[in-house]
């Protein structure tokens, strides 16, 4: 797996955090995958902490820096769980299907991928 970071002032800490999280999730040695992590000043007019988009080959994670650093790391953990979900094919790239079941009409808090990400983000 190739991991690229952009716009983080605490690169060494973020790299260690990501490496440990990927190893914990047992996806640190995936071949032919790219993980791009970008830090921006804010998302969605300051309301969103982060988001992930991707598929089985590449995931892009964006983290907002207008929150405390520890919250940024928690958000990064949450989005890394989504990365694992994309890489494994559990989560569709259009964020509507989980394990081939359509959840396009489900509320945010009822989406299985969000339930899983919230469950494990603090581990």
Annotate each language-model stretch with its function.
Residues 70, 74, 86-115, 119:
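Post-HEXXH active-site segment of zinc metalloproteases
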Residues 77-85:
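Short active-site segment of divalent metal-dependent hydrolases/proteases
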Residues 3, 18, 35-37, 59-63:
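Hydrophobic beta-strand residues in large extracellular and virion-surface proteins
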Residues 36-60, 69:
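Catalytic zinc-binding patch centered on the HExxH motif and its immediate surroundings
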Residues 9-32:
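Zn2+-dependent metallopeptidase catalytic core
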């Amino acid at each position: 797996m190739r991991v690229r970071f952009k716009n983080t002032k605490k690169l060494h800490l973020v790299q260690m955090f990501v490496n440990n999280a990927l190893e914990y999730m047992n996806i640190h040695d995936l071949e032919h995958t790219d993980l791009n992590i970008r830090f921006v000043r804010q998302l969605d007019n300051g309301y969103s902490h982060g988001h992930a988009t991707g598929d089985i080959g590449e995931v892009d994670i964006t983290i907002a820096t207008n929150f405390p650093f520890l919250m940024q790391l928690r958000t990064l953990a949450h989005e890394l769980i989504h990365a694992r979900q994309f890489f494994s094919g559990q989560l569709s790239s259009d964020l509507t299907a989980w394990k081939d079941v359509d959840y396009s009409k489900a509320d945010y808090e009822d989406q299985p991928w969000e339930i899983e990400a919230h469950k494990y983000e603090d581990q």
